[in-house]
Regions:
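AMP-forming adenylation/ATP pyrophosphatase catalytic core
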Residues: 1-62, 80-84, 117-122, 133, ...
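ATP-dependent adenylation/nucleotidyltransferase module used to activate substrates
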Residues: 10-13, 17-166, 202-203, 209-210
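Short beta->alpha junction loops/turns
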Residues: 59, 119, 156-157, 197, ...
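Generic macromolecular interface patches on structured domains
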Residues: 76, 80, 111, 136, ...
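Short strand-loop junctions, especially beta-strand C-caps/beta-turns
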Residues: 86-89, 218-220, 288
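Residue-level marker of alpha-helix boundaries and capping positions
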Residues: 92, 129, 194-195, 292
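Catalytic subdomain that performs nucleotidyl-dependent activation
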Residues: 143-153, 161-255, 281-285
């Protein structure tokens, strides 16, 4: 009798999951959601469809949209996806919000693991330090699960913000376009994917509102003490003034192409004009190595120094 009871419970559980999954998948019939989901699946070109991956969730509309899209993908492709939320404990409400997020997501068959930032909290440069800690915690958890791929919900508005911030800092070409990538590496062990980098926050808000009907707003997103928030407000004002952000995206893409070209010639310079001796870990450079444009020589030298120092 106990065996049959367990079997019945298992069947009921599977049946309940199937109902939840069908309710999630039906939203893909919406034209905008379908378009975003199709674009989201572009990570398949990196041959990840056979691997499990992880998703970082903040509880905001953009990360909830990512939770939905990745869940649909996992259902359709029988892939395991791990979900992580970092509780920074920078606000009194953060722990209760993290618990509430976990409970609400469970209703959609999304099991979100809460990672807590334990230890002394910074009093200055808070957002930057919190971001580093967030990546550290998620990276550690991913590697523990033998999972090298993490998806994050950076979108087009984030790309614009990052570009303007780096422009104000006086960043060079490489720095200006560093965010405009679908895939980057973190700490040599983890690959970060930004599958939503081509979509606006409004697009992701649409998904979140339609599917989940809830989201968590971090009060710091309205705190003008943070430069990022001031830049965000500036961008909103520029939109009201009629600024065409599609042209800004075109500019960023053109700069990215230029950066790609420079990287090509850097690799050619290293390959043709240097020789590496692995046993003693040193390079011999010929005179032609330095007969290149300044940026090519500079990046080539940086690349060689990193290789010798085992810092890729």
């Amino acid at each position: 009798n106990l065996f049959f009871k367990k079997q019945n419970m298992k069947k009921k559980s599977l049946s309940a999951k199937k109902i939840i999954h069908n309710k999630l998948l039906i939203h893909l019939k919406n034209p905008l959601i379908s378009k975003i989901y199709t674009e989201f699946q572009n990570f398949n070109k990196f041959n990840l469809n056979k691997y499990n991956f992880s998703v970082a969730l903040s509880g905001g509309a953009d990360s909830l949209a990512l939770a939905y899209l990745s869940k649909c993908y996992s259902i359709s492709n029988n892939i395991k996806v791990k979900y992580y939320h970092v509780n920074h404990k920078l606000r009194k409400e953060s722990s209760s919000e993290a618990k509430k997020l976990k409970i609400l997501l469970k209703k959609f068959d999304i099991d979100c693991k809460i990672l807590n930032w334990i230890g002394k909290k910074p009093k200055s440069n808070i957002q930057s330090i919190a971001r580093v800690k967030r990546y550290e915690l998620i990276s550690k958890e991913c590697l523990k699960d033998r999972n090298n791929f993490i998806f994050i919900a950076h979108h087009l508005d984030d790309l614009y913000e990052n570009f303007i911030i780096r422009l104000l800092r006086g960043s060079g070409l490489k720095g200006l376009v560093s965010f405009n990538q679908f895939k980057t590496n973190y700490d040599h062990k983890l690959t970060i994917f930004r599958p939503l980098i081509c979509f606006t926050k409004n697009d992701l808000n649409f998904i979140s509102k339609r599917v989940f009907k809830f989201k968590f707003e971090d009060p710091s997103n309205k705190n003008t003490n943070f430069k990022r928030i001031r830049i965000r407000n500036l961008m909103n004002n520029l939109k009201l003034e009629g600024m065409n952000f599609e042209k800004l995206k075109l500019t960023i893409n053109n700069l990215s192409d230029s950066n790609f070209t420079i990287n090509y010639y850097v690799n050619e310079n290293i390959k043709s004009n240097s020789k590496y001796f692995n046993k003693k870990k040193y390079y011999i450079l010929n005179s032609t190595f330095f007969n290149q444009p300044h940026e090519i020589v500079f990046r080539s030298l940086i690349s060689l120094i990193k290789k010798i120092g085992n810092k890729y």
